[in-house]
C-alpha cells in the first residue's frame, strides 16, 4: 500500500512537472512535434508503411506457413526459434522496427506460435531495417557504404547470437510443430485486412516518434549547456534512435567509437522503439516483457563485435581520425569488452534459469 502511494505521488508530480514545462515552454514542444511529424512523413511512413502491407499479406495469404514448412528447420537449428518464427525473423531484419513485432503478433493470433514462443520471438525478431542503416547511417552520417555494410552485418550477427543465448535448444516436438490449417482468404479480403493493420501500426509508430521527439527537444534544452557533444548520441539515442544517430555527425570521437555507438543504438533501439514494440505486441494480446533485456544484450554484443571487427576493415580510413583516438582505444577498449562479457554471462544465466523454472 505504501509503495502504491509512493508510485502515485511520483506519477502525480511528474505529470504536474510536464504540464508546467508545456505551459512555460510551448515553443519547444511545438518544434518537437513538427520535427517528429517531418521525420514520419519523410522517412518512416515511406519506408515502413508499404513494408507493413506486404508483410501482412505474406502472413495472411499463407506464404509464411509455406516458407516455414520448407525452411523452418534452418531457423530451429541456427536461431533456436520455432520453425514458424523464422519468417518473422527475416521480416524483422528487412522491414525495420517494429515490423518483426507485428509479424510475430499476427503469427500468434493465427495460432502458428504459442504464447511462450511468441513472447521470446518478440524480443529477437525486432531489428533496424537496411534502408535506415544504409540510407541514413551509411549515407548521411558516415558517408561511406562500408559503414552501412559493417553495421548491417554486425546487427545480423548480434541478433543471431542473442537468439541462441536467450533460448534453450528446441525439443523434437517443437521442431516438428506445424502451423494449424487456416482458411485461405481471397486476395481482396486479405489486402483490406493488411492495409488496415498496416495503417494502425503506422499511426502507432508516428505517435511514439512524435512524443519522443518532444522529449528529445526538452532534453537538449535542459542539458544542452552541460551535455558534451560526444555524449549527445548516447543520451539522445536512449530516447529516440534517429535523434541519437543524427547527433553522431557532430561527434568528435574516432570513427571506431562512433561505429560502436551506432551499433549499440541500432540493436537497442531506444525507449521510443521499445514503446512502439510493446504497443504493437499489446495489440496482439502479448506483453513483450523480454524486449528490454534482450535488446540491451544485443546492443552490448553489437558494440563488442564492432570494436573487434573495426581494425580488420580499417575504419579509420573512412574519415579523418580525431585527436586522442589512440589513447581512448587503449583505455576504453578493454573496458567495453569486459562489460560486454559480463552482460553476456549475466543474461545467459538469467534467461536459462527462467526457462528451466517455466516462468516464460
Each predicted region: which residue ranges?
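Alpha-helical transmembrane segments in multi-pass membrane proteins
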Residues: 42, 47, 51, 55, ...
Amino acid at each position: 500500500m505504501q509503495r502504491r502511494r509512493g508510485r502515485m505521488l511520483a506519477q502525480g508530480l511528474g505529470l504536474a512537472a510536464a504540464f508546467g514545462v508545456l505551459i512555460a515552454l510551448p515553443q519547444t514542444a511545438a518544434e518537437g512535434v513538427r520535427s517528429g511529424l517531418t521525420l514520419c512523413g519523410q522517412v518512416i511512413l515511406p519506408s515502413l508503411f508499404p513494408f507493413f502491407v506486404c508483410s501482412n499479406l505474406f502472413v495472411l495469404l499463407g506464404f509464411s506457413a509455406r516458407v516455414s514448412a520448407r525452411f523452418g528447420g534452418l531457423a530451429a537449428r541456427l536461431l533456436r526459434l520455432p520453425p514458424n518464427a523464422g519468417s518473422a525473423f527475416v521480416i524483422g531484419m528487412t522491414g525495420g522496427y517494429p515490423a518483426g513485432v507485428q509479424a510475430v503478433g499476427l503469427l500468434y493470433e493465427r495460432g502458428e506460435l504459442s504464447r511462450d514462443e511468441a513472447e521470446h520471438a518478440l524480443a529477437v525478431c525486432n531489428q533496424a531495417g537496411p534502408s535506415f542503416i544504409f540510407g541514413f547511417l551509411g549515407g548521411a552520417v558516415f558517408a561511406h557504404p562500408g559503414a552501412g555494410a559493417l553495421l548491417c552485418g554486425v546487427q545480423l550477427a548480434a541478433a543471431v547470437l542473442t537468439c541462441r543465448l536467450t533460448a534453450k535448444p528446441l525439443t523434437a516436438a517443437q521442431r516438428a510443430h506445424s502451423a494449424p490449417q487456416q482458411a485461405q482468404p481471397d486476395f481482396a479480403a486479405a489486402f483490406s485486412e493488411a492495409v488496415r493493420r498496416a495503417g494502425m501500426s503506422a499511426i502507432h509508430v508516428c505517435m511514439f516518434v512524435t512524443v519522443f521527439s518532444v522529449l528529445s527537444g526538452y532534453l537538449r534544452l535542459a542539458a544542452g549547456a552541460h551535455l558534451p557533444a560526444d555524449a549527445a548520441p548516447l543520451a539522445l539515442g536512449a530516447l529516440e534512435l534517429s535523434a541519437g544517430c543524427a547527433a553522431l555527425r557532430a561527434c568528435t570521437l574516432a570513427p571506431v567509437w562512433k561505429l560502436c555507438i551506432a551499433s549499440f543504438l541500432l540493436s537497442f533501439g531506444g525507449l521510443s522503439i521499445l514503446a512502439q514494440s510493446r504497443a504493437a505486441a499489446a495489440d496482439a494480446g502479448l506483453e513483450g516483457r523480454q524486449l528490454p533485456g534482450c535488446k540491451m544484450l544485443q546492443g552490448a554484443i553489437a558494440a563488442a563485435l564492432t570494436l573487434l571487427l573495426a581494425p580488420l576493415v580499417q575504419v579509420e580510413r573512412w574519415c579523418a581520425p580525431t585527436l586522442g583516438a589512440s589513447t581512448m582505444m587503449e583505455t576504453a577498449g578493454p573496458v567495453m569488452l569486459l562489460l560486454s562479457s559480463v552482460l553476456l554471462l549475466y543474461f545467459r544465466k538469467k534467461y536459462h534459469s527462467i526457462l528451466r523454472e517455466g516462468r516464460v
